Amino acid sequence: MDIDPYKEFGATVELLSFLPSDFFPSVRDLLDTASALYREALESPEHCSPHHTALRQAILCWGELMTLATWVGNNLEDPASRDLVVNYVNTNVGLKIRQLLWFHISCLTFGRETVLEYLVSFGVWIRTPPAYRPPNAPILSTLPETTVVRRRDRGRSPRRRTPSPRRRRSPSPRRRRSQSRESQC
């Protein structure tokens, strides 16, 4: 059975696979982050969100996997076999857990739409030949800001609020102001 754990969240395993394996922090760092930011919600008997539920499940799976790894470490006599199991867990299962934890923590922190937009942006960036792409990859925490800049105000700062001098405003607000001043006098 081929189950995609990201499907109900609008993402796919393939979308996350564009991010290199060294992109994801260690499981320990991700667990510490989840605990620091969401401990109360994760330990609560109440349902908070599907991301909290998925995060709980990933944390529980990692705990069970560590229990199994400890058992294997204590019961496998052959050091070569033990190393094979440990390497497999760290390389394959560890990466999947790191991806899951990162995805759900990021969705809770930045919002699902921002994370999905980031994954698509990074996927486009990484598949673009180096000669034709910007030197730096998109950054998740600044994505909404840079997306607005690229789409609407190419070359301008994102905070610019004053209209350009060529644009003229409708005369009606000025008339209203002048009429109200006259009535106050």
From Swiss-Prot:
PTM: Phosphorylated by host SRPK1, SRPK2, and maybe protein kinase C or GAPDH. Phosphorylation is critical for pregenomic RNA packaging. Protein kinase C phosphorylation is stimulated by HBx protein and may play a role in transport of the viral genome to the nucleus at the late step during the viral replication cycle.
Ranges spanned by the short sequence motif Bipartite nuclear localization signal, renumbered to the chain: 160-177
Comp. bias regions, Basic residues: 149-178
3 X 8 AA repeats of S-P-R-R-R-[PR]-S-Q, as annotated region: 157-179
Annotated segments matching region Disordered: 136-185
Region of interest called RNA binding, as start-end residue ranges on this chain: 179-185
Pfam families the record matches: Hepatitis_core
Each Sequence repeat, start to end: 157-163, 164-171, 172-179
An example Gene Ontology biological process: viral penetration into host nucleus
Molecular functions per Gene Ontology: DNA binding; RNA binding; structural molecule activity
Residue list for modification Phosphoserine: S157, S164, S172
Primary localization: virion
GO CC entries: host cell; host cell cytoplasm; T=4 icosahedral viral capsid
Function comment: Self assembles to form an icosahedral capsid. Most capsids appear to be large particles with an icosahedral symmetry of T=4 and consist of 240 copies of capsid protein, though a fraction forms smaller T=3 particles consisting of 180 capsid proteins. Entering capsids are transported along microtubules to the nucleus. Phosphorylation of the capsid is thought to induce exposure of nuclear localization signal in the C-terminal portion of the capsid protein that allows binding to the nuclear pore complex via the importin (karyopherin-) alpha and beta.
Family as reported in the entry's similarity comment: Belongs to the orthohepadnavirus core antigen family.
HAMAP family, sorted: HBV_HBEAG
Quaternary assembly: Homodimerizes, then multimerizes. Interacts with cytosol exposed regions of viral L glycoprotein present in the reticulum-to-Golgi compartment. Interacts with human FLNB. Phosphorylated form interacts with host importin alpha; this interaction depends on the exposure of the NLS, which itself depends upon genome maturation and/or phosphorylation of the capsid protein. Interacts with host NUP153.
The protein's name: Capsid protein
Species of provenance: Hepatitis B virus genotype A2 subtype adw2 (strain Rutter 1979)
Name of the encoding gene: C
